[in-house]
Amino acid sequence: MSVILRNDYGAIAVNKGVIERMIIDDLLDIGDEIILCTKKGKPIKDKPARFYDPSRFTDPDYFDAVEVYEKKQQVRVKVFIITAFGSSISELTDEIFRRIENDFAILKLNNPGIITVNIKGVMSEDQIVRRNIEVIRKNV
């Protein structure tokens, strides 16, 4: 499935898997502050494999952490994460928003209409405490 992005020059179709892969790669670069998770808050991996590492394959479970879809002629992005205890939610979400918008700029696309970061839990030393915090950025 592809996402169709429209601008003054016409329409561009980009495979949503390409955008999701770029976003996941950026999320993995953030480091120990986040763990990618599913919609229900289940952690995907403790030490995920990198996409650009030729010795490893892409695990399809990673794609459960990111949703890219089109609604009302806007691209929308949802990200599902678990944060580390003590990390600043505002700083962390701002960094995620900036990286996602940068990915769209690399592809010469308009910023997504809505970016949503769903924080499904907070990880302490030995357990994950469930949370359901949603931080939204609207680009109009």
Predicted regions, residues:
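Contiguous, often N-terminal, cationic amphipathic patches that form binding interfaces
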Residues: 1-95, 106, 110, 116, ...
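Acidic-enriched and Gly/Ser
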Residues: 101-103
